[in-house]
From Swiss-Prot:
The modification S-glutathionyl cysteine is found at residues 182, 187. InterPro entries: CA_dom (IPR001148), CA_dom_sf (IPR036398), Carbonic_anhydrase_a-class (IPR023561), Carbonic_anhydrase_a-class_CS (IPR018338). It catalyses: hydrogencarbonate + H(+) = CO2 + H2O. The keyword Protease does not apply. Its cofactor is Zn(2+). This is Carbonic anhydrase 3. It comes from Sus scrofa (Pig).
Length: 260
């Protein structure tokens, strides 16, 4: 069996390029954001998300993260505007987190690591499938939201309450009637750049929209995320507590801000 990628020493981010050479490409994510080097681009528009809560389908534990999956067979839950020149369909969202509250995000802002990072993955509906979209530099748009420790977020609890049904790798449960825009911060200001998926195969097909304002979650809520296992039900238990990729070289890419 081929070696499976993961986050451990033997199969972690430093090894991904052995199986997926593009992981050492010129447009890899995440990156470190240095705000003094980022220019405001007045041509960047506001972005809008119109999500249909009925398009939420299931929540699953794939051994790498917890993921909420949406029906993307037609234009039900859409992302538009911002740096995007087309409408993008919501496919899934997932999270990255660390073993403690002081780290876990993949992108960093002026050296700051957040407790977690939420990724809402959308694909360009001008392509006929998600698989086709992956082959194009404008194929996918990801909205990234930082989670910092503070007050509990009630809307996030809806996701966390479902985790008991998907404790171990391979578990999936119904998860319906959920509008992920309830997880957005009040401020829609964003940074944008061209990058990649932060997990293998690390395809370089992503327009990133990273929201400047984090949302707050409680330390107890983060602990609930860490209660998941990366092991299957019949295997020795391995906690799912470190699933972030470190920042990658920016290699001359330009990051733009929608705000001054």
């Amino acid at each position: 069996m081929a070696k499976e990628w993961g986050y451990a020493d033997h199969n972690g981010p430093d090894h991904w390029h052995e199986l997926y050479p593009i992981a050492k490409g010129d447009n890899q994510s995440p990156i470190e954001l240095h705000t003094k080097d980022i220019k405001h681009d007045p041509s960047l528009l506001p972005w809008t998300a119109s999500y249909d809560p009925g398009s939420a389908k299931t929540i699953l534990n794939n051994g790498k993260t917890c993921r909420v999956v949406f029906d993307d067979t037609y234009d039900r839950s859409m992302l538009r505007g911002g740096p995007l020149t087309a409408a993008y369909r919501l496919r899934q969202f997932h999270l990255h987190w660390g073993s403690s509250d002081d780290h876990g995000s993949e992108h960093t802002v002026d050296g700051v690591k957040y407790a977690a990072e939420l990724h809402l993955v959308h694909w360009n509906s001008k392509y006929n499938s998600f698989a086709t979209a992956l082959k194009h530099p404008d194929g996918v748009a990801v909205v990234g939201i930082f989670l910092k420790i503070g007050r509990e977020k009630g809307e996030f609890q809806l996701v966390l309450d479902a985790l008991d049904k998907i404790k171990t790798k391979g578990k999936e449960a119904p998860f319906t009637n959920f509008n992920p825009s309830c997880l957005f911060p009040a401020c829609r200001d964003y940074w944008t750049y061209h990058g990649s998926f932060t997990t293998p195969p690390c395809e370089e097909c992503i327009v990133w929209l990273l929201l400047k304002e984090p949302i707050t979650v409680s330390s107890d809520q983060m602990a609930k995320l860490r209660s998941l296992y990366s092991s299957a039900e019949n295997e020795p238990p391995v906690p799912l507590v470190r699933n972030w990729r470190p920042p990658q070289p920016i290699k001359g890419r330009i990051v733009k801000a929608s705000f001054k």
